[in-house]
């Protein structure tokens, strides 16, 4: 059975990505208020369009240049929640920059996600 061209499995994946991004955003805000992070710009409300955009990227051949609110987009491209937390907390295992880049400036060499600068 399909809904607007999407299978039940595809819709569950989309919902899971949107939900994960929202919960990640909420947790990052809590950590910021606890003094465990130093910068956060929320992405809540942007998730659906970011997931839709991410699903139309050819992973492995297309390059992406996300801006600071595109957390759901990066999740859709294959970044994990753990990798996004490593970036947010500026940890050495952060795939974006080994903890040297400003948080919310996503990058991932293996996924062709190019980090921005500010």
What are these regions (language model features)?
Residues 1-39:
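Cofactor-/ligand-binding subdomain signature composed of acidic, glycine-rich
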């Amino acid at each position: 059975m399909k809904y607007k061209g999407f299978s039940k499995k595809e819709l569950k994946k989309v919902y899971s990505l949107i939900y994960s991004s929202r919960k990640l955003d909420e947790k990052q805000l809590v950590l910021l208020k606890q003094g465990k992070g130093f910068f956060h710009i929320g992405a809540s409300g942007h998730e659906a369009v970011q997931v839709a955009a991410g699903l139309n990227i050819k992973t492995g051949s297309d390059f992406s240049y996300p801006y600071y609110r595109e957390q759901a987009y990066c999740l859709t491209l294959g970044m994990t929640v753990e990798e996004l937390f490593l970036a947010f907390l500026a940890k050495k295992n952060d795939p974006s920059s080994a903890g040297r880049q400003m948080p919310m400036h996503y990058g991932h060499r293996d996924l062709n996600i190019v980090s921005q600068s500010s």
